[in-house]
């Protein structure tokens, strides 16, 4: 899976989970500051990403994922 494919899938999941237009979701979008996610939204988003990509995102790692790009980099590293 290429970085672009991961980005598209992450953007789609973020758009759906946070109820924002897909055009608003960019690689540098911050989940809380730009997309209005609260802490519960963030937990649900992490769970959705884990399920969609069949990976585990430890709590420590999840705390470091603040933007769409951060999520893509983490997933890319996990999927190797």
UniProtKB/Swiss-Prot annotation:
Subcellular localization(s) per the UniProt record: Cytoplasm
Residues with the modification O-(pantetheine 4'-phosphoryl)serine, per the entry, are: 39
Q: Which family does it belong to?
A: Belongs to the acyl carrier protein (ACP) family.
* Annotated coiled-coil segments of the chain: none
GO BP, one annotated term: lipid A biosynthetic process
Question: Origin, by domain of life?
Answer: Bacteria
General function of this protein: Carrier of the growing fatty acid chain in fatty acid biosynthesis.
Task: Give the Gene3D superfamilies listed for this entry.
Answer: ACP-like
- Gene Ontology CC, one term: cytosol
* Molecular function GO labels: acyl binding; acyl carrier activity
Q: In which pathway does it act?
A: Lipid metabolism; fatty acid biosynthesis
NCBIfam families found in the cross-reference section: acyl_carrier, PRK00982.1-2, PRK00982.1-4, PRK00982.1-5, PRK12449.1
Q: Which UniProt keywords apply?
A: Cytoplasm, Fatty acid biosynthesis, Fatty acid metabolism, Lipid biosynthesis, Lipid metabolism, Phosphopantetheine, Phosphoprotein
Name of the protein: Acyl carrier protein
Instruction: Give the species this sequence originates from.
Output: Prochlorococcus marinus (strain MIT 9515)
Which Cys pairs are S-S linked? none
Q: What is the lineage of its organism?
A: Bacteria, Bacillati, Cyanobacteriota, Cyanophyceae, Synechococcales
Supply the InterPro entries for this chain: ACP (IPR003231), ACP-like_sf (IPR036736), PP-bd_ACP (IPR009081), Ppantetheine_attach_site (IPR006162)
According to the entry, every stretch annotated as the Carrier domain falls at 1-79
Q: What happens to this protein after translation, modification-wise?
A: 4'-phosphopantetheine is transferred from CoA to a specific serine of apo-ACP by AcpS. This modification is essential for activity because fatty acids are bound in thioester linkage to the sulfhydryl of the prosthetic group.
């Amino acid at each position: 899976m290429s970085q672009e494919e991961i980005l598209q899938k992450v953007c789609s999941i973020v758009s759906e989970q946070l109820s924002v237009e897909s055009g608003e979701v960019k690689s540098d979008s911050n989940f809380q500051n730009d997309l209005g996610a609260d802490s519960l939204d963030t937990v649900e988003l992490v769970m959705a990403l884990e399920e969609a990509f069949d990976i585990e995102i430890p709590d420590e790692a999840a705390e470091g994922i603040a933007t769409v790009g951060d999520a893509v980099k983490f997933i890319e590293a996990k999927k190797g």
